[in-house]
């Protein structure tokens, strides 16, 4: 079998001659491959044995030999690329092709559905791995979506209309202002085999009391089998949605004893985790799922950090049969990138500094400094939601004279954060301000556990927005620390549905604590033979409802 090295050398010859027959000499070919005449003769013999080309040598000084290509170099390159992809070896793939843009297209062309022994498989390309899939811990946008595929909660939130629906509980009722009752389905099983018990539900809900949004849960009991009572310390009109939010997923009560649970979680959802490594997340349809069995048998999400700068964070690449990926769906996100000025900073605690930064670092100014690659995906934001226009259009103010150094903090494994921070640095440098870029892990960022003048942040909201917007921001310790406010008054108003969210958000923008930057276009790319794909506000879709039309694609 020809070696990969020989394949690569043939591809270089084929590219040099553009696949056309040529009259040439050993020396000319040796120059192309940067080797000796003796070695090129050996290579040509091996390529000829492999059936890739025909070499008709002519002897005599000045005579030129005939080179005919029998194999298409592009096809051979695609074959080698697929071998490297199967090995998750993108680094060698980049070396093979020599251009990351080309590699990106090649990779996307290989992400296709496959039918193995009657199984319907979907492959997805993503820019980073998912080491933490534990509900109740700090989760990023994509992890929140995946948690919903692996776990269930008492209720679930309809992604389209934002209404609470039956999930583990088939009915529920509010018995009093502080007492709710949920009626659970029988015969529900976890992925590792055992049946769901009421003790699992009680342990999961009591575990949540350490989280700010769930701190008002006073106790959880089961008066009779398959009935759960939740008692609150204060009324919460949002409880039926709160119990269906990503943090409130039900775990087996022994979850802490299960090996590597955060990476290999066990739930009751439509998909179970089979493998979760630095290269790939593999989830398989759970045949004992209590609801409709998923139509896609297996989903493999490949992680390609080597191509991170060529993959937009909010574009999800599904299977595709060509390099020209069809856009299955696209939308502007509910949420945005924004800057948070830190109340703990002696510099950004000052109104004049915050106001100057907001006048300088406008969305339009940042877009003018970014690559066209990102301009296509970013839209100026003037409020946390697309329909809000809270940022005031003010002329650029004079820099406070004592400001010469600033620090911005962002979380790692997010190349668009890195890109935005580089733009911020370039703009501030022109103003005579040195910007230090501090990159931390996600937990440190989420909790605001480091010193910084301001932070680069993002928030993605889901339906209903009047629930998720405050819930998402309130459960982010970083926001409270930057505002210097524990929001205890606001959360009580919100639970009673008496808080005007738009007025509250406008206030923190007006005071220049929060500065909106960009809304992001979310996009799904793949074959149109895929059905049942409805993009949610996180840019993903419900795997269990998707299917392939075998007569198309």
From Swiss-Prot:
A GO MF term: DNA binding
Domain of life assignment: Bacteria
Region (Solute-binding): 163-494
Keyword Transcription regulation: yes
Pfam families the record matches: SBP_bac_5 (PF00496), SgrR_N (PF12793)
Entry annotated with the keyword Metal-binding: no
GO biological-process terms attached to the record: negative regulation of DNA-templated transcription; peptide transport; positive regulation of DNA-templated transcription
Ranges of residues in domain HTH marR-type: 1-117
DNA-binding region location: 26-49
SUPFAM superfamilies membership: Periplasmic binding protein-like II, Winged helix' DNA-binding domain
Protein known as: HTH-type transcriptional regulator SgrR
Gene from which this protein is expressed: sgrR
């Amino acid at each position: 079998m020809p070696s990969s090295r020989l394949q690569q050398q043939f591809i270089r010859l084929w590219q040099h001659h553009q696949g056309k027959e040529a009259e040439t000499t050993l020396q000319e070919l040796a120059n192309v491959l940067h080797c000796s005449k003796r070695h090129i003769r050996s290579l040509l013999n091996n390529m000829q044995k492999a059936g890739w080309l025909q070499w008709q040598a002519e002897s005599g000084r000045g005579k030129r030999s005939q080179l005919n290509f029998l194999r298409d170099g592009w096809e051979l390159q695609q074959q080698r690329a697929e071998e490297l992809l199967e090995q998750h070896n993108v680094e060698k793939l980049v070396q093979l092709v020599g251009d990351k843009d080309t590699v990106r297209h090649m990779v996307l062309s290989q992400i296709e559905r496959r039918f193995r022994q009657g199984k319907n498989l979907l492959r997805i390309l993503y820019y980073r791995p998912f080491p933490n899939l534990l509900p109740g811990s700090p989760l990023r946008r994509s992890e929140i979506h995946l948690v919903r595929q692996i776990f269930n909660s008492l209720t679930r939130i309809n992604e389209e209309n934002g209404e609470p629906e039956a999930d583990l509980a088939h009915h529920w009722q509010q018995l009093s202002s502080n007492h709710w009752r949920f009626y659970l389905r029988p015969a529900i099983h976890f992925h590792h085999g055992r049946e769901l018990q009421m003790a699992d539900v009680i342990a999961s809900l009591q575990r949540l009391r350490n989280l700010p949004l769930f701190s008002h849960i006073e106790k959880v009991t089961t008066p009779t089998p398959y009935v759960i009572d939740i008692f609150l310390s204060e009324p919460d009109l949002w409880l039926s949605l709160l119990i269906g939010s990503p943090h409130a997923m039900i775990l087996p009560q022994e979850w802490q004893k299960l090996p590597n649970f955060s990476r290999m979680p066990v739930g009751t959802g439509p998909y179970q985790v089979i493998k979760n490594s630095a290269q790939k997340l593999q989830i398989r349809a759970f045949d004992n799922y209590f609801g409709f069995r998923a139509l896609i048998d297996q989903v493999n999400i490949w992680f390609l950090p080597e191509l991170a700068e060529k993959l937009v964070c909010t574009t999800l690449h599904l299977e595709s049969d060509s390099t020209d990926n069809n856009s299955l769906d696209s939308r502007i996100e509910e949420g945005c990138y924004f800057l948070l000025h830190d109340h703990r900073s002696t510099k950004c605690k000052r109104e004049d500094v915050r106001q100057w930064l907001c006048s300088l670092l406008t969305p339009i100014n940042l877009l003018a400094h970014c690559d066209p690659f990102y301009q296509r995906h970013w839209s100026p934001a003037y409020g946390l939601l697309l329909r809000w226009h809270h940022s005031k259009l003010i002329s650029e103010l004079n820099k406070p004279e004592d400001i010469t150094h600033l620090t911005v903090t962002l979380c790692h494994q997010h190349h668009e954060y890195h890109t935005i921070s580089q733009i911020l640095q370039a703009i501030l440098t022109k103003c005579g301000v040195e910007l230090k870029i501090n990159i931390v892990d996600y937990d440190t960022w989420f909790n605001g556990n480091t010193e910084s003048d301001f932070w680069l942040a993002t928030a993605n909201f889901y339906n209903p927005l009047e629930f998720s917007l405050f819930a998402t921001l309130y459960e982010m310790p970083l926001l409270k620390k930057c505002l210097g406010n524990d929001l205890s008054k606001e959360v009580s108003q919100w639970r009673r549905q008496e808080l005007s969210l738009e007025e509250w958000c406008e206030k923190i923008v007006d005071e220049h604590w929060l500065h909106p930057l960009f809304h992001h276009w979310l996009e799904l790319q793949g074959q149109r033979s895929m059905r049942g794909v409805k993009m949610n506000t996180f840019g993903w879709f419900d795997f269990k409802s998707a299917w392939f039309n075998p007569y198309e694609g």
